[in-house]
């Protein structure tokens, strides 16, 4: 059976991995998942990510902890296959009054809400991370 929402699966694997204090989580790889992982790494929510395997590439995310506590407090899917959520540049949300990030898919690639606002771009709100 095929997966209905691979991004929600990725976010759930991160959430479950951190609640179980796992060092790393693996999942099937895709271009969008790589772009989201890159944003999470740049913002300091994960240590690193790498791709393993040739025929079926797997994405491995090394999770990040601070003083034994998970860095990602909450990670929530916003736009989903059944209900896409798009926002203009002036409508982009601030997560936890600017302490968290919204991951946005724009015409110039996947970026944070802050970067999209600076670039003057709107797009699809993929998820909130705090």
UniProtKB/Swiss-Prot annotation:
GO BP annotations listed: translation
Protein keywords: Ribonucleoprotein, Ribosomal protein, RNA-binding, rRNA-binding
Listed GO MF terms: rRNA binding; structural constituent of ribosome
Pfam families to which the protein is assigned, alphabetical: Ribosomal_S8
InterPro entries assigned: Ribosomal_uS8, Ribosomal_uS8_CS, Ribosomal_uS8_sf
Annotated signal peptide: none
CC annotations in GO: ribonucleoprotein complex; ribosome
NCBIfam families found in the cross-reference section: PRK00136.1
Entry's family note: Belongs to the universal ribosomal protein uS8 family.
Stated role: One of the primary rRNA binding proteins, it binds directly to 16S rRNA central domain where it helps coordinate assembly of the platform of the 30S subunit.
UniProt subunit comment: Part of the 30S ribosomal subunit. Contacts proteins S5 and S12.
Protein's UniProt name: Small ribosomal subunit protein uS8
Organism: Erwinia tasmaniensis (strain DSM 17950 / CFBP 7177 / CIP 109463 / NCPPB 4357 / Et1/99)
Lineage: Bacteria, Pseudomonadati, Pseudomonadota, Gammaproteobacteria, Enterobacterales
